[in-house]
Amino acid sequence: MVNMKASMFLTFAGLVLLFVVCYASESEEKEFPKEMLSSIFAVDNDFKQEERDCAGYMRECNEKLCCSGYVCSSRWKWCVLPAPWRR
């Protein structure tokens, strides 16, 4: 009788331990996507848009000059790519 009680106790303790380990790993897995998304969409100072003295493509060019490689459209007042018919 004692041997059967000990084996039942060890079996029960093993099942409880297995349940605790599975629950802990499942709770970590639930937090993992949240951590991953927050790290992906975190705003970093290196990726912020920087202020420039020139206007880029399709930006207004009233006060600002267009960046190199672009010209100010006389009709729309936007910086556009130069074309043979634009001078």
UniProtKB/Swiss-Prot annotation:
PROSITE patterns to which the protein is assigned, alphabetical: HWTX_1 (PS60021)
Sorted UniProt keywords? Disulfide bond, Ion channel impairing toxin, Knottin, Secreted, Signal, Toxin
Q: Give a yes or no for keyword Manganese in this entry.
A: no
Q: What is its main location?
A: secreted
Q: Pro-peptide positions?
A: 25-52
Q: Where in the cell is it found?
A: Secreted
InterPro entries tied to this protein: Huwentoxin-1, Huwentoxin_CS1
Question: Is-annotated flag, keyword Signal?
Answer: yes
Task: Identify the tissues in which this protein is expressed.
Answer: Expressed by the venom gland.
N-terminal signal peptide: 1-24
Q: Give the UniProt entry's GO cellular component terms.
A: extracellular region
Q: List the disulfide bonds.
A: 54-67, 61-72, 66-79
One GO molecular function term of this record is: toxin activity
Q: What does this protein do?
A: Ion channel inhibitor.
Task: Fill in the domain comment.
Answer: The presence of a 'disulfide through disulfide knot' structurally defines this protein as a knottin.
Give the family, as the similarity comment puts it: Belongs to the neurotoxin 10 (Hwtx-1) family. 51 (Hntx-8) subfamily. Hntx-8 sub-subfamily.
Record protein name field: U3-theraphotoxin-Hhn1p
Give the organism the record lists.
Cyriopagopus hainanus
